[in-house]
């Protein structure tokens, strides 16, 4: 049922077999609305400034770490419900399951009360999910949502071929273009509050999937950081790689929208997985007041790759150099949690230089047992001993980590296993990076990526404590070399001599995927 509702409530499929021209007409330029007086978020920002006092300033924002999956969904609902003027949302993936439909229903409710909504989604995910599910639908969910007079939808790097067969041939003929994806994750409300980090929109990111749950991370920022994020959003909104849904022949009417949402609320109310969430929009003023009192103060920079402009079809990848420069400023220690890591010889040599000048490096990533993308592990595993020889302390997540009930699962759902999805780092106990960027070839050379750097000892201390908790023996294996140079996985008294896996076929898959080039992942 949820795959059907996704077409009603989300941008997840374009029907038909039409072929579009290679050069697509672009939409009119647009920009974020300046922060307006009035509304819960304006009051929250004012309260934050008053609380910070001399500690505040024109460049200082408040930050709240979204560590637990349930809280990550709840605060997205809070910002959407609290918006009075504008919502700008940018996501790589927005699945049509319970969480995706719930969030989109609240976005439509915001538009109903006059909020201007702009949505950018990557066309790779909008066009595949329901086709794989073999759902047959008379109208595109994308068109239905875009039919709202207060909602504008644009697609990043859209398919020119709209049928599955056409997309297959397009992938072969134009692989370089098709392989460029937008991996950004961003929600901005009233240009005052922002959520950014590693989570897409879908049950596995919010503890609502019984198959598996992601250990992920976002931050909620209030203040100038929202305006910084809006500049990134506008850059994509006005780029050559983003096309309005209507220019792709994806059209519907407001009547289609009204008809589509008949029964949505009842279906959400009846969904067992959503028992801890209200379906109707809520008043979050008290929650926002409490939030403000506990936020960490810090100055910030929102970083992003640059979408192609002036007929350029390729993303300009500035993030790798920015991250490298950030790390080279470390004086004492760097602690990293990152889901997907595939280095090369140059990266290992660079790490050896960093540890050689006295900087302690600790890295937490996925094990084969916790991986949701085994192809990444197939190309990462050969580098374990290189990491260790370079002086890196290496940890790998357990699939049944003790921390799962605390931060992964949202009752009543219990995930079958936990996989790491976060992308964050703490530098010298005072500087934090949280974003969408993995440490693999796709993130460095193909996807657009983004993140925020925050100068905040308080936020850094909280994030560091959480990563160190995830490195404890009940949550991860420490990967070490024995006296013969062989790799071991150590967890308390447990010592494993081959990489842990959930089952035999995972090991078979791991061997097979080594044969495929790592660059395609």
Residue map of PLM features:
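Bacterial N-terminal signal peptides that target proteins for export
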Residues: 1-6
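Charged, low-complexity intrinsically disordered terminal segments
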Residues: 17-185, 189-521
């Amino acid at each position: 049922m949820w795959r059907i509702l996704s077409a009603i409530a989300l941008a997840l499929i374009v029907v038909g077999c039409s072929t579009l021209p290679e050069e697509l007409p672009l939409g009119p330029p647009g920009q974020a609305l300046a922060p307006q007086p009035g509304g819960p978020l304006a009051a929250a920002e004012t309260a934050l400034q008053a609380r910070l006092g001399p500690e505040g300033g024109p460049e200082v924002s408040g930050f709240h770490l979204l560590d637990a999956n349930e809280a990550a969904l709840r605060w997205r609902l809070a910002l959407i419900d609290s918006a009075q003027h504008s919502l700008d949302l940018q996501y790589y993936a927005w699945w049509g399951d319970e969480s995706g439909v719930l969030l989109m229903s609240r976005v439509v409710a915001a538009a109903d009360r006059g909020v201007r909504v702009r949505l950018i989604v990557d066309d790779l995910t909008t066009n595949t999910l329901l086709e794989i599910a073999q759902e047959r639908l008379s109208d595109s969910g994308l068109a239905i949502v875009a039919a709202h007079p207060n909602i504008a939808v644009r697609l990043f790097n859209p398919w020119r071929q709209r049928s599955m067969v056409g997309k297959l041939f397009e992938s072969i003929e134009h692989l370089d273009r098709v392989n460029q994806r937008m991996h950004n994750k961003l929600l901005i409300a009233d240009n005052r509050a922002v959520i950014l980090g590693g989570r897409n929109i879908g049950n596995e990111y919010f503890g609502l999937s019984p198959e598996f749950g992601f250990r992920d991370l976002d931050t909620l920022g209030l203040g100038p950081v929202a305006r910084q994020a809006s500049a990134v959003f506008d850059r994509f909104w006005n780029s050559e790689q983003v096309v309005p849904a209507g220019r792709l022949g994806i059209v519907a009417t407001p009547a289609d929208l009204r008809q589509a949402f008949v029964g949505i609320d009842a279906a959400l109310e009846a969904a067992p997985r959503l028992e801890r969430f209200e379906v109707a929009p809520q008043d979050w003023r008290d929650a926002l007041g409490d939030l403000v009192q506990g936020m960490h103060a810090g100055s910030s920079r929102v970083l992003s790759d640059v979408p192609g402009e002036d007929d350029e079809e390729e993303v300009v990848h500035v993030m790798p150099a920015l991250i490298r420069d950030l790390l080279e400023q470390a004086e004492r220690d760097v602690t990293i949690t990152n889901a997907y890591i595939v280095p090369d010889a140059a990266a290992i040599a660079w790490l050896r230089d960093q540890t050689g000048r006295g900087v302690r490096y600790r890295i937490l990533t996925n094990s084969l047992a916790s991986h949701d993308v085994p192809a990444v592990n197939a190309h990462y595993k050969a580098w374990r001993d290189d990491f260790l020889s370079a002086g890196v302390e290496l940890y790998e997540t357990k699939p049944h980590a003790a921390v799962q009930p605390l931060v992964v699962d949202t009752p009543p759902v219990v995930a079958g296993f936990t996989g790491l999805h976060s992308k964050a780092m703490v530098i010298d106990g005072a500087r934090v990076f949280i974003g969408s960027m993995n440490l693999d070839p796709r993130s460095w050379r193909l996807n657009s990526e983004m993140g925020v750097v925050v100068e905040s000892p308080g936020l850094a201390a909280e994030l560091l404590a959480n990563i160190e908790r995830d490195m404890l023996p009940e949550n991860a294996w420490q990967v070490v070399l024995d006296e013969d140079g062989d790799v071991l996985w150590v967890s308390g008294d447990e010592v494993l001599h081959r990489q842990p896996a959930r089952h035999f076929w995972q090991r078979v898959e791991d061997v097979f995927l080594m044969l495929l080039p790592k660059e395609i992942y």
